[in-house]
Swiss-Prot record:
Pfam families tied to this protein: NUDIX
MF GO annotations: bis(5'-adenosyl)-pentaphosphatase activity; guanosine-3',5'-bis(diphosphate) 3'-diphosphatase activity
This protein's encoding gene: rppH
UniProt cross-references to Gene3D superfamilies, sorted A to Z: Nucleoside Triphosphate Pyrophosphohydrolase
GO biological process, alphabetically ordered: nucleoside phosphate metabolic process; ribose phosphate metabolic process
Its EC number(s): 3.6.1.-
Residues annotated as domain Nudix hydrolase: 8-159
Protein family according to the UniProt entry: Belongs to the Nudix hydrolase family. RppH subfamily.
UniProt-recorded name of the protein: RNA pyrophosphohydrolase
Amino acid sequence: MARYEDLPYRTCVGVMLINREGLVFIGRRAGGIEHVDDTHVWQMPQGGVDPGEDTWKAAKRELYEETSVNSVEKLAEVPDWLIYDIPRTVAGRAWKGRYRGQRQKWFAARFTGADSEINVVHPGGGHKAEFTSWRWEPMHNLPELIVPFKRPVYERVVKEFSQLAAAV
Protein backbone atom coordinates (compact mmCIF):
# COMPACT_ATOMS: atom_id res chain seq x y z
CA MET A 1 0.00 0.00 0.00
CA ALA A 2 1.25 3.48 -0.87
CA ARG A 3 2.23 5.95 1.80
CA TYR A 4 -0.53 8.40 2.71
CA GLU A 5 1.58 11.35 1.52
CA ASP A 6 1.99 9.75 -1.91
CA LEU A 7 -1.68 9.05 -2.54
CA PRO A 8 -3.44 11.23 -5.15
CA TYR A 9 -6.63 13.23 -4.72
CA ARG A 10 -9.83 11.93 -6.28
CA THR A 11 -11.24 14.40 -8.83
CA CYS A 12 -14.80 15.28 -7.84
CA VAL A 13 -17.56 17.85 -8.13
CA GLY A 14 -19.97 19.29 -5.60
CA VAL A 15 -23.33 21.03 -6.01
CA MET A 16 -24.88 23.66 -3.79
CA LEU A 17 -28.54 23.35 -4.78
CA ILE A 18 -30.43 26.51 -3.82
CA ASN A 19 -34.22 26.76 -3.81
CA ARG A 20 -36.36 29.82 -4.55
CA GLU A 21 -36.32 30.79 -0.86
CA GLY A 22 -32.51 30.88 -0.84
CA LEU A 23 -32.17 27.69 1.23
CA VAL A 24 -29.69 24.93 0.39
CA PHE A 25 -30.35 21.21 -0.08
CA ILE A 26 -28.51 18.93 2.34
CA GLY A 27 -28.76 15.19 2.63
CA ARG A 28 -28.23 12.97 5.65
CA ARG A 29 -25.49 10.52 4.68
CA ALA A 30 -26.49 6.86 4.63
CA GLY A 31 -23.20 6.04 6.32
CA GLY A 32 -19.55 5.59 5.58
CA ILE A 33 -16.33 5.11 7.42
CA GLU A 34 -15.31 8.75 6.98
CA HIS A 35 -18.12 10.00 9.21
CA VAL A 36 -16.99 10.64 12.73
CA ASP A 37 -20.25 11.08 14.65
CA ASP A 38 -23.99 11.55 14.27
CA THR A 39 -23.83 15.34 14.49
CA HIS A 40 -21.84 15.68 11.26
CA VAL A 41 -23.79 13.50 8.83
CA TRP A 42 -25.25 16.18 6.57
CA GLN A 43 -23.69 17.23 3.28
CA MET A 44 -24.40 18.60 -0.17
CA PRO A 45 -24.36 16.30 -3.22
CA GLN A 46 -20.89 15.48 -4.50
CA GLY A 47 -19.14 12.75 -6.42
CA GLY A 48 -16.49 11.66 -8.85
CA VAL A 49 -15.78 12.97 -12.33
CA ASP A 50 -15.49 10.33 -15.03
CA PRO A 51 -12.39 10.46 -17.29
CA GLY A 52 -12.89 13.16 -19.93
CA GLU A 53 -16.20 14.32 -18.43
CA ASP A 54 -17.04 18.03 -18.31
CA THR A 55 -17.26 19.13 -14.67
CA TRP A 56 -20.68 20.81 -14.96
CA LYS A 57 -22.07 17.70 -16.68
CA ALA A 58 -20.53 15.60 -13.91
CA ALA A 59 -22.17 17.85 -11.31
CA LYS A 60 -25.60 17.47 -12.93
CA ARG A 61 -25.10 13.70 -13.22
CA GLU A 62 -24.08 13.35 -9.57
CA LEU A 63 -26.99 15.53 -8.48
CA TYR A 64 -29.41 13.30 -10.38
CA GLU A 65 -27.80 10.07 -9.14
CA GLU A 66 -28.09 11.22 -5.50
CA THR A 67 -31.35 13.21 -5.50
CA SER A 68 -33.29 12.49 -8.76
CA VAL A 69 -33.15 16.25 -9.47
CA ASN A 70 -32.94 17.40 -13.09
CA SER A 71 -34.61 20.82 -12.75
CA VAL A 72 -31.59 23.07 -12.27
CA GLU A 73 -29.97 26.19 -13.68
CA LYS A 74 -26.27 26.83 -13.20
CA LEU A 75 -25.69 29.99 -11.17
CA ALA A 76 -21.98 30.07 -10.40
CA GLU A 77 -18.77 28.10 -10.07
CA VAL A 78 -15.93 28.35 -7.56
CA PRO A 79 -12.95 29.35 -9.75
CA ASP A 80 -10.47 27.15 -7.87
CA TRP A 81 -10.30 23.45 -7.17
CA LEU A 82 -10.88 22.91 -3.44
CA ILE A 83 -8.98 20.14 -1.68
CA TYR A 84 -9.49 18.20 1.52
CA ASP A 85 -7.62 15.30 3.10
CA ILE A 86 -9.44 12.45 4.78
CA PRO A 87 -8.06 11.51 8.19
CA ARG A 88 -5.13 9.10 8.10
CA THR A 89 -7.10 6.77 10.37
CA VAL A 90 -9.59 6.03 7.57
CA ALA A 91 -7.45 6.62 4.48
CA GLY A 92 -6.65 2.93 4.07
CA ARG A 93 -10.34 1.98 4.04
CA ALA A 94 -11.98 4.88 2.21
CA TRP A 95 -12.00 4.50 -1.58
CA LYS A 96 -10.10 1.20 -1.19
CA GLY A 97 -7.02 3.10 -0.02
CA ARG A 98 -6.43 4.70 -3.44
CA TYR A 99 -6.85 8.37 -2.46
CA ARG A 100 -5.84 10.70 0.35
CA GLY A 101 -8.78 13.02 -0.19
CA GLN A 102 -10.68 14.89 -2.85
CA ARG A 103 -9.98 17.68 -5.31
CA GLN A 104 -13.38 19.29 -5.90
CA LYS A 105 -14.91 21.74 -8.36
CA TRP A 106 -17.99 23.34 -6.78
CA PHE A 107 -21.08 24.70 -8.52
CA ALA A 108 -24.12 26.62 -7.33
CA ALA A 109 -27.38 25.71 -9.04
CA ARG A 110 -30.92 27.04 -8.69
CA PHE A 111 -33.52 24.34 -8.11
CA THR A 112 -36.39 25.17 -10.47
CA GLY A 113 -38.59 22.16 -9.77
CA ALA A 114 -41.00 21.15 -7.03
CA ASP A 115 -39.83 19.44 -3.83
CA SER A 116 -41.71 16.33 -4.98
CA GLU A 117 -38.99 15.86 -7.64
CA ILE A 118 -36.44 15.12 -4.91
CA ASN A 119 -36.08 11.44 -4.07
CA VAL A 120 -33.02 10.42 -2.07
CA VAL A 121 -34.31 6.97 -1.06
CA HIS A 122 -34.75 5.76 -4.65
CA PRO A 123 -32.51 8.15 -6.60
CA GLY A 124 -32.32 8.52 -10.37
CA GLY A 125 -30.96 5.81 -12.62
CA GLY A 126 -31.35 3.06 -10.04
CA HIS A 127 -28.29 4.19 -8.10
CA LYS A 128 -27.70 3.15 -4.51
CA ALA A 129 -29.06 5.71 -2.05
CA GLU A 130 -26.33 7.89 -0.53
CA PHE A 131 -28.74 9.84 1.66
CA THR A 132 -31.46 8.62 4.03
CA SER A 133 -33.29 11.95 4.26
CA TRP A 134 -32.94 15.57 3.20
CA ARG A 135 -33.97 19.10 4.10
CA TRP A 136 -33.51 22.74 3.10
CA GLU A 137 -31.06 24.59 5.32
CA PRO A 138 -29.83 28.21 5.56
CA MET A 139 -26.49 28.44 3.79
CA HIS A 140 -24.61 29.88 6.77
CA ASN A 141 -25.36 26.72 8.83
CA LEU A 142 -23.67 24.29 6.43
CA PRO A 143 -20.09 24.30 7.75
CA GLU A 144 -21.24 23.19 11.22
CA LEU A 145 -23.16 20.22 9.81
CA ILE A 146 -20.35 18.62 7.78
CA VAL A 147 -17.61 16.31 9.06
CA PRO A 148 -14.80 18.46 10.49
CA PHE A 149 -12.20 17.55 7.87
CA LYS A 150 -14.46 18.92 5.09
CA ARG A 151 -15.34 22.11 6.99
CA PRO A 152 -12.73 24.40 5.33
CA VAL A 153 -14.10 23.44 1.90
CA TYR A 154 -17.67 24.18 3.02
CA GLU A 155 -16.60 27.51 4.53
CA ARG A 156 -15.05 28.50 1.20
CA VAL A 157 -18.09 27.34 -0.80
CA VAL A 158 -20.43 29.33 1.47
CA LYS A 159 -18.21 32.40 1.14
CA GLU A 160 -18.12 32.10 -2.67
CA PHE A 161 -21.88 31.63 -3.02
CA SER A 162 -23.24 33.72 -0.11
CA GLN A 163 -24.68 36.37 -2.44
CA LEU A 164 -26.91 33.66 -3.96
CA ALA A 165 -28.75 32.95 -0.69
CA ALA A 166 -31.40 35.61 -1.28
CA ALA A 167 -34.86 34.39 -2.21
CA VAL A 168 -35.95 34.83 -5.83
